[in-house]
Amino acid sequence: FLAKKVAKTVAKQAAKQGAKYVVNKQME
């Protein structure tokens, strides 16, 4: 089902953003 695929893509993007946020926090 398409919605499931979209949800998975969104989750992957969110994880990528979250990882970037964590790295930026550790850099400070």
UniProtKB/Swiss-Prot annotation:
It is found in: Secreted. The modification Glutamic acid 1-amide is found at E28. Expressed by the venom gland. Keywords: Amidation, Secreted, Toxin. GO terms for biological process: defense response to bacterium. Its main location: secreted. One of its GO terms (cellular component) is extracellular region. One of its GO terms (molecular function) is toxin activity. Pfam families: Cu. Belongs to the cationic peptide 04 (cupiennin) family. 01 subfamily. This is Short cationic peptide-1a.
